[in-house]
A protein has these predicted regions:
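Mid-core helix/loop region of P-loop NTP-binding domains shared across ATPases and GTPases
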Residues: 2-17, 57, 92, 102-112, ...
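Short, hydrophobic-biased segments on the C-terminal half of alpha helices
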Residues: 78, 174, 359-363
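Post-Walker A helix-loop "phosphate-sensing" segment adjacent to the P-loop in P-loop NTPases
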Residues: 79-91, 119-122
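Terminal-proximal interaction/regulatory segments of ATP-powered molecular machines
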Residues: 324-414
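Conserved catalytic segments around the Walker B and adjacent sensor/switch elements
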Residues: 59-61, 84-102
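Walker A/P-loop nucleotide-binding motif
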Residues: 55-80
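C-terminal helical "lid" subdomain and adjoining coupling/linker elements of P-loop NTPases
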Residues: 167, 239-244, 252-313, 327-333, ...
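A short, basic N-terminal segment
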Residues: 1-58, 83
């Protein structure tokens, strides 16, 4: 007797598979060769090289827009460094990768570091996800690290999100990490901060900046030719040969990603989604039509993810723009946006931010592509921002409705 999904699953068993290794198109994949990033690799390698002699390297800040290769270069250089240490019979550095957008509190950062070096509680159990004083979990980590002459390199990916979420707490987390070396006896910690925001430094406490930003490495966006080269390299690894025989597919993906400030991550995501669309439909080849459709899917998913991961204060500001747009306002100005935001903040029992801080959050929402702003001069009355939603009201409304707290407020405001 045929079962409900037999025919669907049979499609995946028949014919030539589209993918050979789809993981080659994911952000965490580290290829054997990294094209177009020799300068940055050499720079980071030269800074980290002293670890092979048992000397702690300087802290590094890597800057560049999303998809410019910052994270993959850091992973690649550390991977080669560890391999070289093992080949040479010297102690390899310990490494940890912390995604600061996900691991956003001091406790969770320290807990992940404990996990990475297998630092445990006095009774041998794992450090719990919650419940310990931060000082205690810090002591557990430092005691384990200092049990030998260790050098640990901690990569803080999207480090700017720590400070954007909460300036004071973010600076405290970074300061706590940078001052560890003053308390350790046998070991040392070095940090690699990775930021998508070139203005990130302006938000740092001077005492953090002076220590964290000892060395800076800039990653410029990839151009169209470089994106095409990266795509071709990954196509050869990820797809079976007949799957992408139309060169126009790679050219189109590269051109679309070049419009997105040379975002290689976006290009690889677009290529993977195109392949998955072809696979689900039982098509043997990836076409430009698949690419166009994949682009629409990714844009929709990107907006959803961007809104869902916003801090609550930023959601409140976005909601105020949405509420005014929903009332039929085409051009929304900072002052009226602030008035509605104040109502929302009060209803959510949030601290009401100053108008200047709300203006900063409006700029951040503009940078994320959720709203469009234009600065307008009002003569002797100064300047203001004209604001419009950059995405459909319906889509924003559906996402905001999924937030339980905001959906309750919406009933009173809309």
């Amino acid at each position: 007797m045929e079962k409900p999904l037999d025919k669907l699953f049979d499609k995946f068993l028949q014919g030539q598979a589209i993918f050979r290794d789809r993981n080659a198109l994911r952000p965490t994949y580290v290829p054997d060769e990294l094209p177009y990033r020799d300068e940055q690799m050499n720079r980071i390698g030269a800074i980290l090289g002293p670890t092979l002699r048992g000397a702690p390297p300087s802290n590094i800040l890597c800057y560049g827009k999303t998809g410019t290769g910052k994270t993959v270069v850091a992973r690649y250089v550390l991977q080669l460094l560890i391999e070289k240490a093992k080949q040479s019979g010297v102690v390899a550095p310990l490494t940890a990768f912390v995604n600061c957008r996900i691991v956003g509190t001091n406790y969770r950062v320290l807990r992940q570091l404990c996990e990475d070096i297998d630092a445990r509680m006095p009774d041998g159990s794992e450090v719990p996800f919650t419940g310990l004083p931060t000082d205690e979990i810090r002591s557990i980590f430092m005691r384990k690290l200092d049990s030998g002459p260790n050098i640990m390199v901690v990569v803080l990916d999207e480090v700017d999100s720590l400070v954007k979420r909460d300036v004071s707490q973010g600076n405290d987390i970074l300061y706590g990490l940078t001052r560890m070396n003053g308390e350790l006896i046998n070991s040392r910690v070095s940090l690699i901060g990775i930021s998508n925001d070139l203005k990130f430094k302006e938000m740092l406490d001077p005492r953090v900046l002076s220590t964290l930003g000892e060395e800076e490495v800039i990653f410029a966006p990839y151009n169209a030719v470089e994106l095409k080269g990266i795509l071709q390299q990954r196509v050869d690894i990820a797809f079976n040969k007949p799957a992408i025989s139309d060169e126009g597919v790679i050219n189109l993906v590269g051109a679309l990603a070049a419009q997105e400030h040379g975002d290689a991550r976006r290009a690889l995501d677009l290529l993977r989604t195109s392949g998955e669309l072809a696979e689900r439909r039982g098509d043997e080849k990836v076409t430009q039509g698949h690419v166009r459709e994949a682009q629409k899917i990714i844009e929709r998913d990107t907006i959803t993810e961007a809104v869902k991961t916003l801090p609550l204060q930023s959601k409140a500001v976005l909601f105020s723009v949405y509420a005014l747009a929903n009332r039929g306002k085409k051009d929304i100005f900072t002052g009226e946006c602030y008035n509605v935001y104040s109502e929302i903040a009060k209803a959510l029992s949030l601290d009401t931010l100053t108008q200047r801080r709300v203006s900063d959050l409006i700029s951040e929402l503009d940078m994320l592509g959720l709203i469009n702003t234009t600065v307008i001069s009002k003569g002797r009355y100064g300047r203001t921002k004209k604001i419009r939603l950059a995405v459909g009201k319906k889509q924003i409304g559906i996402i905001l409705d999924e937030d339980v707290r905001l959906s309750k407020v919406a009933k009173d405001l809309l």
